[in-house]
C-alpha cells in the first residue's frame, strides 16, 4: 500500500477551491471532482494532491479526512477535534436527504500549488456536468474495483495512478516518493 502524509490544509483548501468554482454542491460531486484531480496529479507529477486516504464506497471513492470534516460540519460534533475545527469552513444542509456543502470562507490559494489548481480546474471541467450516475460509473475504475473487493476498502495511490493511465516510469516514481514521505511502504 502506498501511503502519503495527509496535508490537512491542502485538503481543506482544495475543497474550498472546488466550491468557489462550482458553488454549493453535494458531498458526492465534491468527492469525485477531488478524486479525479488527485488521479490526474498522480499521473502527471507522481504525487497526490492532498494525501487524503480514499475509501472504495458503493458510490465511488471517498476521501476520509474530508468526509470527517463535512460530517463534523453537518452534525456540529465529531470524535475528531481536528475535523471539528476544520469543519467551521463549511456549512452542510440537507435537502431531501442529500447533504449540500456551502463554504463559509474563501480558499487560501497559497496552500495550493499551480499544479494542484490546474488538476482541480481540469477535473471540474471534465466532471462538473456529469450526473450522479455518470460520475459514479466513471469513478468505479480499476483502483476502486480492486479496493472494493478487498477486506480493507482503502484505495492504493499506485492503483489510482495506474487506473488514470500513469506511465510505468511514473508508477515507479510514486513508489519511491511514497517510501520517502512516510517510510510506510508495504
For the regions a language model picked out, list residue spans one by one.
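Domain-edge interaction signal
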Residues: 1-186
